């Protein structure tokens, strides 16, 4: 029995290594093809097609080739968001408008989890604006706020630090509780902060829990037919990314 168990574990480990290597090979091929198509579009003078292919290539690079990086700078995450929104704007034309507002350029040097914002924006497009008949807007905004920490062990000792607010909101159809297999309470039916079990949101919350413990907030407000607002509050953290992080 023990020999069989060891063999099965070794087999699983080998399969995992093979799958990892395969996952590394396929993206390189795809990006080479994209680069070739982009170049052909550029040479043919088709600037619109060139920009779309280039944006898609950059989006995929940000999602796949940097998968080992846990945290990146805000400006790098925003580049991924902008590439995604550019492509969706090309797809939906006048149906989609978007705004990205950053209170201070220094905020772009903060470190945040990789792919923290982009999946929320993707969710806003897919589940908020896509089902909507009329045109819609997505807003991404970020600002910092001073936060006073009190040390209970040392009387009257206080420390001022900064916290980062990240907001993604849309004026789409709102959250569909039936598809989420949720029965909203009376409070949830109003445009109040809600608890949720949506898989995408839950994955984001789990990631934040792992990286920040209890030192974060993840809030959602939604009203059917009017839209959804997501707010993430994190410690503001600037600096270079440590090696291997």
Pin down the residues of each PLM region.
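Two-component histidine phosphotransfer core
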Residues: 1-221, 229, 233
